[in-house]
């Protein structure tokens, strides 16, 4: 049961998940914002009825090898501290082919890479599930406008 707030909620696709119409973006935590600031923002968001939170393995922004996954770690630390994982509808993303330091670069959307990305995110987030898992950036050789170039692996 969601806390009574002025927030509006919608069903997420064809699921039974009810998400707030405002989503908390987290991409600055670990670079531009500290863990303390991230905790304050998560507490405030949840108090206002914002239960839909977005993150990604590549965060914090700007992406750097030294801060890869830092935002997910901050969220995981908050989950561990507050025990409120069940109050949040969490979205995360596997990054696309963009950085050599992320599993060697290359095709990030193959089965092996997606599995490794998901397992890494779950560990950093200190949870056993992510409600919505997405592809962050398209692979440019994916089929489009009738042209073929995608190779399934």
Q: Positions of the model-derived regions?
A:
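Generic beta-strand or strand-like secondary-structure segments
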Residues: 74-78, 93, 113-120
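Active-site/binding-pocket entry motifs
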Residues: 18, 96-97
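Active-site-proximal loop/turn and secondary-structure-junction residues that shape catalytic pockets
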Residues: 28, 57-59, 94-96, 134-139
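N-terminal binding-site loop/beta-alpha segment at the start of enzyme catalytic domains
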Residues: 2-89
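Surface-exposed, interaction-prone regions with an acidic/low-complexity signature
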Residues: 91, 98, 105
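Glycine/Thr-rich phosphate-binding loops of Rossmann-like dinucleotide-binding domains
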Residues: 32, 61-63, 100, 140-143
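Glycine/proline-rich, positively charged
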Residues: 101-153
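Short beta-strand segments at enzyme active-site cores
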Residues: 52-56, 89-93, 129-135
């Amino acid at each position: 049961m969601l806390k009574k707030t002025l927030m509006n909620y919608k069903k997420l696709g064809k699921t039974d998940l009810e998400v707030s119409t405002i989503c908390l973006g987290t991409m600055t935590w670990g670079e531009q914002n500290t863990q303390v600031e991230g905790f304050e923002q998560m507490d405030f968001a949840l108090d206002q009825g914002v239960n839909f939170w977005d993150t990604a393995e590549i965060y914090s922004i700007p992406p750097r090898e030294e801060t890869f996954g830092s935002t997910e770690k901050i969220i995981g630390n908050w989950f561990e501290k507050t025990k409120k994982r069940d109050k949040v509808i969490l979205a995360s993303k596997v990054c696309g082919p963009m950085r050599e330091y992320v599993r060697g670069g290359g095709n990030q959307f193959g089965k092996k890479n997606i599995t490794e990305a998901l397992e890494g995110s779950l560990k950093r987030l200190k949870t056993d599930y992510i409600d919505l898992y997405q592809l962050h950036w398209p692979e440019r050789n994916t089929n489009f406008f009738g042209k073929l170039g995608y190779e399934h692996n």
